[in-house]
């Protein structure tokens, strides 16, 4: 699907964090390997049994705020997920195209807002190790509002809190379900990321334009 952004009509760029500005390899390793292995070792079950259990646990709360909530998972699994996140912090890395794109947005006068479903502790750890916050104008965790990006109530709350105009906004995320929610709210431009995890094959989007390198956008932006 062709990317055709009329930049002169864009005031605000909303950006997801994990997989969009940061390499999703951190989260995929944490939630698909480290957490199941740690829970399995604690409970004396095989790695396969632990993974199957975790898959069901994840599925049960998919697209809800609990899916992203470290406190929920700590209580559910009997693990100190916040401490584990802190310990793994050095693994958090920026995508190669993140800083060039964010700086180009700044140079062109666009407002850069982080909108992440990440738990505040998760966000703080990643900011500490990446310095991402130095390249953004505003950082928002959906936990502050009580709804994830999949929920229309979140979009209304964010618009009210920031004053953004949906018809003059670009939103970039690596989840098609979340892009769908943004489009439903009225966000004019919704763009998917095909390579959120540098270690796995690119993904495809059915209903939204997508790309694998933000630097492709810079010439038209400038």
From Swiss-Prot:
Disulfide bonds: none annotated. It is an enzyme of class 3 (hydrolase). It comes from the Bacteria. Mg(2+) binds at residues 9, 11, 174. It catalyses: a ribonucleoside 5'-phosphate + H2O = a ribonucleoside + phosphate. Keywords: Hydrolase, Magnesium, Manganese, Metal-binding. Substrate binds at residues 9-11, 149. PANTHER family: GMP_IMP NUCLEOTIDASE YRFG, PHOSPHOGLYCOLATE PHOSPHATASE. Belongs to the HAD-like hydrolase superfamily. This is GMP/IMP nucleotidase YrfG. It comes from Escherichia coli (strain K12). The gene is yrfG.
């Amino acid at each position: 699907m062709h990317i055709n952004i009329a930049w002169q009509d864009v005031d605000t760029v909303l950006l997801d964090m994990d997989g969009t500005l940061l390499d999703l390899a951190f989260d995929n390793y944490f939630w698909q390997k480290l957490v199941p292995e740690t829970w399995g070792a604690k409970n004396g079950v095989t790695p396969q049994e632990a993974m199957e259990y975790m898959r069901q646990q994840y599925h049960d709360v998919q697209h809800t705020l609990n899916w992203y909530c470290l406190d929920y998972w700590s209580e559910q699994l009997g693990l100190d997920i916040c401490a584990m996140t802190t310990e793994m912090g050095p693994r958090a890395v920026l995508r190669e195209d993140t800083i060039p794109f964010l700086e180009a947005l700044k140079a062109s006068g666009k407002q850069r807002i982080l909108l992440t479903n990440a738990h505040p502790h998760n966000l703080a750890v990643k900011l500490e190790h990446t310095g991402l916050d130095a390249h953004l104008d505003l950082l928002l965790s959906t936990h502050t509002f009580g709804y994830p990006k999949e929920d229309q109530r979140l979009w209304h709350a964010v618009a009210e809190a920031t004053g953004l105009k949906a018809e003059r906004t670009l939103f970039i995320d690596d989840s098609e379900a979340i892009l769908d929610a943004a489009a439903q709210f009225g966000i004019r431009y919704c763009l998917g990321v095909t390579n959120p995890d540098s270690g796995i094959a690119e993904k495809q989007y059915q209903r939204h334009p997508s790309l694998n390198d933000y630097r492709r956008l810079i010439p038209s932006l400038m």
